[in-house]
């Protein structure tokens, strides 16, 4: 895969007008886009369908978690939308239900391990007994056993996760920031080159591109850094 196949631009913008502006600015340079709650609930699901019809790949970041039947029903409908990736929290029963519902489709199911905005203090406050690294590895093992298509984790854990899941599963890393850029609300971050060298198959970059004065120039700089690390 080239850097263009690996870079996912997060459309973390408040409305369709902003999303359309970003996609237009990036043109053919970008293949993959991530759409999460913010845009999905502002007309973004139909926009996702349209982008997919235009040949773009869409990572639908819904982080599903519910009873088995509800998760399965949701996944069945998302398969019909033509999405390329879908996230759900890496809980064994939910993952197994999703895998069964997506069987035979091209949808890559991704297990979310620990949010990159969380550190050990946050996990303790939420009632977990594991530090982020340990919990990520445990959930990676569970995702592998469930038959998931990939894992979402920070670049800090990517190398260790890759050893668990092997070379074939997708390893998607958010919290990627070019050197010198603002971390924002992310706590466990790495540069694009570091993410690639750590074993990530795909990198998610949002603010450093969508908030840049020249999004295409920002994206091209990140693509060049990734290509150099491949």
Curated annotation (Swiss-Prot):
Binding site for substrate: 12, 34, 61-70, 116, 177, 186, 207
GO biological process, alphabetically ordered: 'de novo' pyrimidine nucleobase biosynthetic process; 'de novo' UMP biosynthetic process
Known catalytic reactions: orotidine 5'-phosphate + H(+) = UMP + CO2
Top-level taxon in the UniProt lineage: Bacteria
Recorded metabolic or biological pathway in which this protein acts: Pyrimidine metabolism; UMP biosynthesis via de novo pathway; UMP from orotate: step 2/2
Catalytic residue positions: 63 (proton donor)
HAMAP family according to UniProt: OMPdecase_type1_B (MF_01200_B)
UniProt xrefs under NCBIfam families: PRK00230.1, pyrF
Similarity remark: Belongs to the OMP decarboxylase family. Type 1 subfamily.
The protein, known as: Orotidine 5'-phosphate decarboxylase
């Amino acid at each position: 895969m080239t850097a263009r196949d690996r870079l996912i631009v997060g459309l973390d913008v408040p409305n369709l007008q902003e999303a359309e502006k970003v996609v237009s600015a990036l043109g053919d340079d970008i293949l993959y886009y991530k759409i999460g709650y913010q845009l999905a609930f502002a007309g973004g699901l139909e926009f996702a369908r349209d982008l997919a019809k235009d040949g773009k790949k869409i990572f639908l970041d819904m982080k599903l978690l519910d009873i088995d039947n509800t998760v399965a029903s949701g996944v069945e409908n998302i398969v019909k939308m033509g999405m390329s990736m879908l996230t759900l929290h890496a809980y064994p029963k939910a993952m197994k239900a999703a895998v069964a519902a997506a069987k035979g489709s091209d949808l890559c199911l991704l297990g979310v391990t620990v949010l990159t905005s969380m550190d050990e203090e946050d996990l303790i406050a939420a009632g977990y007994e594991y530090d982020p690294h340990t919990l990520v590895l445990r959930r990676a093992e569970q995702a592998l056993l469930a038959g998931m298509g990939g894992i979402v984790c920070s670049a800090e854990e990517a190398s260790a996760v890759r050893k668990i899941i092997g070379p074939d599963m997708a390893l998607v890393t958010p919290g990627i920031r070019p050197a010198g850029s603002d971390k924002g609300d992310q706590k466990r971050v790495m540069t694009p080159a570091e993410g690639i060298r750590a074993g990530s198959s795909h990198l998610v970059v949002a603010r450093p591109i969508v908030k840049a004065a020249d999004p295409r120039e920002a994206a091209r700089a990140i693509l060049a850094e990734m290509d150099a690390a491949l």
